Amino acid sequence: GNGIDENIINNYSTEAATVFVVPVGNQGNTDTHTEGIIEKVGDIKDIEIRVGEKQKNLPIIIWINKPNRVMLSIISPTGEIIDNMEAKNTNNNRIKFLYEKTEMIVNFTSPELSTGDSHIFIRAYNLKAGIWKFRLTGEYIVDGNYYAWIPQRELIDDETKFLNPVKYTTITLPSTTNGAISVGYYNQNNNSVVSESGNGYTRNGSIKPDIVAGGSNALVTTPGGTTSVMTGSSVAGAVVAGCCAL
């Protein structure tokens, strides 16, 4: 990864006796990520998002690997379409849907400064429930890889999800950095895989997580000197951090 947090970790991780341990998150089975391949110029891929009744605002991020280029169309639940927006540098392109009364602000960045890839950032306001389609049409295609994310499950309505989710590439920032030990978790009580734990690879193909540790129904200490039972990659991250300290 090349984000601000990731670069900071990369820089400081080269110092002696310094180890960064980052949990990969618990988004493996939350339907908040999808990805796919546009085979050739003119091919169409629909990214479908079911928006829940309580979901009024939603950010959507789409990455297109360089040097591929696409056009974006957005189709509302009633069938209204904003057609063939080109993925070139535009800031705060405002579009409105007549029937839904929904407004979206679309930012294209191509190439994005740190990666050279195309980045589409969509902010949707006053969303109406139903299936929204974000249609990608190949304009210039080499390998055609694209990736899309919505916020983590805990931050959005339970009914809001991708209709064709992918469990891979679901590790959270900044665990994508090469300068940290990225930690997933498994069920140490029966030695089984846990579907909630974030899955690699990273978007640029780095192998993550680096390691997994037990993180299911673990007895942990809490403020005030009491104990509690917790589950998640943060528990596993704490175990690995302790091992590094030793």
Task: State the predicted function of each range.
Residues 153-167:
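Low-complexity, Pro/Ser/Thr- and charge-rich linker/hinge segments at domain boundaries
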Residues 56-58, 124-140:
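Noncatalytic modules at the cell exterior or secretory-pathway interfaces
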Residues 30-119, 136-137, 163-245:
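Extracellular S/T/G-rich loop segment that most often corresponds to the catalytic His/Ser-adjacent loop
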Residues 4-17:
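Catalytic-core regions built around general acid/base machinery
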Residues 141-153:
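Edge beta-strands of jelly-roll/beta-sandwich modules across compartments, strongly enriched
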Residues 113, 130, 143:
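Flexible, polar/acidic helix-loop-strand segments at domain edges
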Residues 1-2, 23-24, 137-139:
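Short acidic, glycine-rich surface-loop motifs adjacent to enzyme active sites
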Residues 20-25, 183-184:
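Active-site neighborhood of phospho(di)ester-bond hydrolases with catalytic His/Asp-centered motifs
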